[in-house]
Amino acid sequence: MKENEVKDEKSVDVLSFKQLEFQKTVLPQDVFRNELTWFCYEIYKSLAFRIWMLLWLPLSVWWKLSSNWIHPLIVSLLVLFLGPFFVLVICGLSRKRSLSKQLIQFCKEITEDTPSSDPHDWEVVAANLNSYFYENKTWNTKYFFFNAMSCQKAFKTTLLEPFSLKKDESAKVKSFKDSVPYIEEALQVYAAGFDKEWKLFNTEKEESPFDLEDIQLPKEAYRFKLTWILKRIFNLRCLPLFLYYFLIVYTSGNADLISRFLFPVVMFFIMTRDFQNMRMIVLSVKMEHKMQFLSTIINEQESGANGWDEIAKKMNRYLFEKKVWNNEEFFYDGLDCEWFFRRFFYRLLSLKKPMWFASLNVELWPYIKEAQSARNEKPLK
């Protein structure tokens, strides 16, 4: 009987611990219907929104007291249309300022919880920071980070990338002041965890080698590279553009021959550039895809052009099997694969400031250098 009671007590303790752990990791994504409703709630709770709403009180009094309705109307329209814009800007700046005040606590959470590159590992960090910010009156709600991914993104854009781009200690101290030692410790913990991921990834990769039978590069299937590019960029999304082009041709007659010629040329270059960027966006959806690309480059035994051809074949098969790309034609040939590496990976090592439209992939810098060394590329000037 006593043994059963002891077992029951233990099971209750385990259940209560799990419940506490679950409660600890509840995030706004579990509370709100979607990110839009969370965003609207945050705006509604902000001081800027309340000030904007209070502005309507003196405006309504002005409307009643003024004999001329034109001036109140103009001011009301300005407040109506420009007000939301300023509210959004002020809220964004407030979030940035609040986070910058708690960099030390941010670093402590990372050092303690040791999250990896997997967004799910950031759930505890996000939940703890949400509670800490609210309890210490850094933020006026319990929902600063919507989910783990937003917390991970904040870490990269606020700490990892800006700090890694600072090459000398004086620049780091000037930007981050007393937070420098805490940031260094947090980045070391994160880098060590990522290195373990990299080694585990390579071990698993060795256990499941590529099946390269019956793989041919697009250069062997298409007569010209231009044909391959045209097949990629001309699809239903381009249909409105070309309908617009034919409309211009029909309405302009013979008056504007230059526009007739320039429009398709410009659109071709724009769509080609978008296609190249789209490939990187697709590859960046998961960290494992970028790790796979770099690992394939590092471990390729063939050298020169043949080596890049083999890398292109392996990546074409991998991305198709992982349903990242809808066919085995991600890279046209080895030269295209080499250009892609230089453009979207190797170039990151020479950047001096963060990119607003893409990640710097700081975690991958050591492996990008290793891949560059393995392919015997010339160093950037």
Swiss-Prot record:
Protein name: Protein COS8
Highest taxon in the source lineage: Eukaryota
Compartment(s) where it occurs, according to its Swiss-Prot or TrEMBL record: Membrane
Major localization listed first in the record, in broad terms: membrane
Extracellular side stretches: 1-42, 94-237
All ranges on the Cytoplasmic side of the membrane: 64-72, 259-381
GO cellular component: fungal-type vacuole; membrane; nuclear envelope
Sorted UniProt keywords: Membrane, Transmembrane, Transmembrane helix
The keyword Transmembrane helix is assigned to this record: yes
Keyword Transmembrane helix annotated: yes
Family designation: Belongs to the DUP/COS family.
GO biological process, one term: protein transport to vacuole involved in ubiquitin-dependent protein catabolic process via the multivesicular body sorting pathway
Membrane disposition: Multi-pass membrane protein
InterPro entries: DUP/COS (IPR001142)
General remark: Present with 3070 molecules/cell in log phase SD medium.
Stretches that traverse the bilayer: 43-63, 73-93, 238-258
